[in-house]
Amino acid sequence: MTQTPLLLRSDSQGITTLTLNKPDKFNVLSREMMASVQEALDNIAKDTSVRVVILAGNGKAFCAGHDLKQMMADANEQAIRALFKQCSRMMVTLTQLPQPVIAKVHGMATAAGCQLVAQCDLAIASDNATFATSGIGVGLYCGTPSVAVTRNLPRKQAMELLLTGEFIDASKALNYGLINQVCEPENLDDAVIEMATKIASKGPAFIAKGKKLFYSQIEQGIEAAYEQATETMVENMNLCEAQEGLQAFLDKRPMPDWSDR
């Protein structure tokens, strides 16, 4: 009997969609699910044909966090530490991936699922989406989710989420800065593809450099940040993508031709 894959991948015009595929368990991040995502991300990092990644969930939810049954079944300290290190590696990989990652969110995104949304570079949600760092309700402060959440939300809003575990709707998530856009459920596919297509139309080399700089400089003091940004600009100017883009502007062409880059 063929086993249903935990992660689905589809590729179209430089856009890769990864879909968490355990709908009967609300796409929980079991060890096996995280291993599947990690393998896919590692492969994508080396795939120059991929310009944008979309991360989605199958079924009624985006992701309901970790698999609590699996955690309780193997709750010794060594296993728990390994689980959260595995999760942390996956989250860091999302940030270090050369390609931008867009979370496509519907239904609930709770605990590590909310972390996943926060860790992605961009996020678009349907208006039926809900978000929570809900571990506090079962006696677990969402420590690893807090790393991503506190880097996306203002301090007071982040603390409210982390200390109450209460759900917020998509509108409030937008106001908090957790997501970029809210749309009707029937428009979610189009909204995500529209954003992905805009990004995919740009040159991948300078997008990758820009993403790397974005995350690196925000952890630095202002002088070091400007120094790194200056070097990135110099490197960017030497790319053929920049030469084509600037020449297209000077030639008054509608768009640069980055199709073969």
What are these regions (language model features)?
Residues 1-21, 25, 167-200, 208-220, ...:
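Amphipathic alpha-helical segments at domain termini/boundaries
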Residues 92-205, 239, 244:
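Crotonase-fold acyl-CoA enzyme core
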Residues 13, 68, 80, 87, ...:
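A general structural signal for well-ordered alpha-helical segments in protein cores
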Residues 161-162, 213, 231-237:
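Helix-loop "lid/cap" segments that line or gate small-molecule binding pockets
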Residues 1-58, 92:
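Conserved CoA-thioester-binding segment of acyl-CoA-metabolizing enzymes
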Residues 32, 36, 86, 93, ...:
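Charged catalytic carboxylate motif
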Residues 18, 22, 37, 55, ...:
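Terminal peptide-recognition signature
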Residues 35, 46-49, 57-90, 109, ...:
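Glycine- (often His-adjacent) and acidic-residue-rich active-site loop
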